[in-house]
Each structure stands twice: as structure tokens, then as C-alpha cells.
């Protein structure tokens, strides 16, 4: 296929048009008075959002050269979202500022490679300074503030802070759509897995259709149980103790299941059978997790263990087990705390080493089930459009909070970037490298300018005053006041601010060193789009009648 080429100034200008188109659409959402963007969807109602990365991913431009520029900035937003989960609009604003400022200098004869080195050195110093003014997040109130700033909603901030307090920083917090209007928090204590009872006759509470076992023994095996004789010896030992039994096996069927149900209905013995969660290797790992949590031993032929010779010592215990049609929850398993914490450390190490996002997510879920529990934030709204928008905001807030817990927080509202302006300006560089550093200095002011601009005021006045204020004092665009940002609860996670700056600088440096751009030539759509050749002369077919 034939290609179109553009060189030097032409190439960069064409790509800059794309950068500006995308960034201008994204940056209107920045700050407490930022607006929303409406995205057309082929099916269903349009999506209304203020999430930078969601907007950036939707934008594709007709001109191939402009589209390349737009996609470069879109990558800044995506990368920041992958690393920190929020700050995508800030990253886009920073990238646009660095690219525009850098392009002016390259056009007037500066060397792009020197500029690139200057940008990299200035950003490295800026990141160090950000870490220097960062404060750790320890209180529930600080967590609530970060989530509230990200979502623009104090109620969401409190919900996320409560969820993290209940399930711990390692806990799984999922976001689901609610059937009602209200947004609420639901916490599942203990370990829950998605397998229910093998037979509805096993329920103990007919109204709720659930089986509740108080202080039960727990048998864990990876075998199918079809013959009751296999488990009879261990069943007799449990009956003597007068306690209920939870059986977790690959499957319980046929005569074994029938015997358990009959004994339950007669009131002789209370046992609930549940299929093992997961599949393949993940199933083995999950059974091992349950065993560690309850102090049981997984009875598996891999270890040379047999059900017939199993004893009551190999069973686990828990204070309570609740089994519904779809889920089983084990509360307060009586496993050894040291064994549990070493298992948690092992899973955490696996998660850090894993390169697959899917595996990471599954390991994180297992970690949460062992370490604390699972919290579900059910998002409610009046319409589907509002629900989608609210759900996106809460997801951003949750990511932002996690990033904050990891690396601490800095004054929000773009203040931290201006706070480090003086230290970065003291960096002594020569020639084009000094030009690169000045590009970063100008970009550090841009998020504040944009937040103020979105609030309907002049950014330059605020930025100049902010440079003279001491660290932490900033402009609250929501109330039009100068406040101590941390005390006012306007904070950003250090990780989010740092990632936004690093990713923006990376793409800007690449952009400025671009000297040629190659794109596919647009196809000429001629007439009937390559149909069949002239079909004249077929009129004579009448003679075939």
C-alpha cells in the first residue's frame, strides 16, 4: 500500500493539531468546576463522563497525521491510568503544555535531543521534590479526602474510606450497579467463594433459603464423592462430636448426596456439601487457601492421602459457615495466624511477579479473602446515563485512594506541581538542556491554570501568587479561597501526580525528536467501489425463454 510522508516542521505541526484536538476535549473536565463530555454510543444511551482516559480512548481523527498526535497523548492518559488509576486529565494537560512549548523552541532552532535531555533531568528532580513534600496517609479521614477530591463527592469519599477500614488496604473492593437510587456499601466478612449447596434440601433457614452451620467441622478434598462408604469413617467421628459438617469436594453426587440429604431431613446429622471453587490449578490453590484459613488439610491423592483413612484431626474449623444457592462464606476460620500470614506473603509475592493482569486480579482476590474480606459498593442513580457516569467516578476515586495509601499524598488542585517550581528552576543546565528544563517549568503551572480557567477566572494571576506562597497553601477553585490544601481536604495521591508528570514528559520528549512521519495514503473511493465489469449485452437473454 502506498504511503504518505511528512518531514520536520510539517510533520510536527500536523501531529500537534491532533494533540490539541484531543487535549482540548479532555481538559475541560479538570478541577471542581470542570464540565462533562458526552460520548456517542452506537447502542444505548450516550455516555457522559469527566474521566480523561475514557474520553481519550474514544477519539479517532480522520487525518492520519493528526490522529497519530492524538493517539500519542491518548497513550499518556492510558499509561497513567494503568499505573495510578487516576490523574489522566492532568497527564494530558501536562503533555500538551510540554509539546506546545517544546515545539516553539524546536521551530526557532533548538536541538530536540538537547531539549529531551533537559526535560528528563528536570522531571527527575521534580519527582524527587514531590516525594519530599509527600505525606503518608494513615487516618480514615485522609482516605476519605482523597476519594472525595477524585470523585467530587464527599459521600463517595466516606463510603470508600469505610470500605477500606472494614476490609483493610489489601481487601477487595468491587463496584457494582445497584437496583435502587442510593449508593451503599455491603461488606462480606470472612472468606466467600462462588459455590452454593449441592442440594436445596440442605438449607436450615427456609425463609432465606440458606444453610447456616454454627461451629462446624470442614472437610476439604479435590476428589469426587459418589459412595458414602468413602467418607463414612470421618462422618462417624464428626457425629460423635455432635457438630455439623461442611464438605468441600470436586463433586458430591449419587448415593453419597442422597445419604447426606436423608440424614439431614431425619435430623440425625447436619451436613452441607459444596463443590470446590475455581478450575484446574487455581482450584488447588483456592482449596489450599481455605485449608490454611480453617486449619484443615486438603485430602488429595497428590499427597498420598485417602478419604477412607481421614481422621477428624485433618478437618478444619470455623465459628460459622453460611451457604446460599450461589455462595459459601466461611467466617472466623480457626487456622494458625502465622500460617495464614505466611500464605498471604506468598500470594502477594506471586502477584508482584505476575505479568498477566488477569492472574494479578485473581491473586489479589485470593489475598483479600485471606487477609480481610470483600466490600461491594453498590452504585445507585435515577437514570442509566447518570449511573454509568457515577460508576466511572467511583472507580477513579477508588484507584486514586489505593495509589494514595501506597505512596502518600501531596497538596491537591495542581498546587504541589507549582510548590516544587522554585527547586526545579534552580537546576543548573547549559544551552538546549536549560531550554528543556524551562519547558517543564512552564508545564508545571498548566494544571493550576486549567483548573482556574475552568472555574471562569484568569490563571496567570493565581499562578504568580501561588509561586510566592509557602508549600501547602493553594487556591480552592470550588470556593474561590486561598487555603491550606491539606487541612481543607484537597489532596492528590503522590503516585498519581508523579505518574502524570513522568508519562507526559516521556511522550513529549518522543514527540519533539520526531523528524519524519509515515502514514497510509487514503484510499480513493471510485464510483461503484470495484464492482463487476460492464454487464452490457445481456439483453439477448430474452431468447432463452
Swiss-Prot record:
Record text on subunit structure and interactions: Forms a cylinder of 14 subunits composed of two heptameric rings stacked back-to-back. Interacts with the co-chaperonin GroES.
Keywords, in A-Z order: ATP-binding, Chaperone, Cytoplasm, Isomerase, Nucleotide-binding
Cysteine disulfide links: none
InterPro entries tied to this protein: Cpn60/GroEL, Cpn60/GroEL/TCP-1, GroEL-like_apical_dom_sf, GROEL-like_equatorial_sf, TCP-1-like_intermed_sf
GO biological process: protein refolding
Similarity comment text for this entry: Belongs to the chaperonin (HSP60) family.
The protein's enzyme class: isomerase
GO cellular component assignments: cytoplasm
Subcellular localization(s) per the UniProt record: Cytoplasm
Residues noted as binding ATP in the record, renumbered to the chain: 29-32, 86-90, 413, 476-478, 492
Function: Together with its co-chaperonin GroES, plays an essential role in assisting protein folding. The GroEL-GroES system forms a nano-cage that allows encapsulation of the non-native substrate proteins and provides a physical environment optimized to promote and accelerate protein folding.
One protein family per Pfam: Cpn60_TCP1
CDD domains: GroEL (cd03344)
GO molecular function: ATP binding; ATP-dependent protein folding chaperone; isomerase activity; unfolded protein binding
Enzymatic reactions: ATP + H2O + a folded polypeptide = ADP + phosphate + an unfolded polypeptide
Protein name: Chaperonin GroEL
Lineage: Bacteria, Bacillati, Bacillota, Bacilli, Bacillales
EC number: 5.6.1.7
Organism: Oceanobacillus iheyensis (strain DSM 14371 / CIP 107618 / JCM 11309 / KCTC 3954 / HTE831)
Keyword Iron found: no
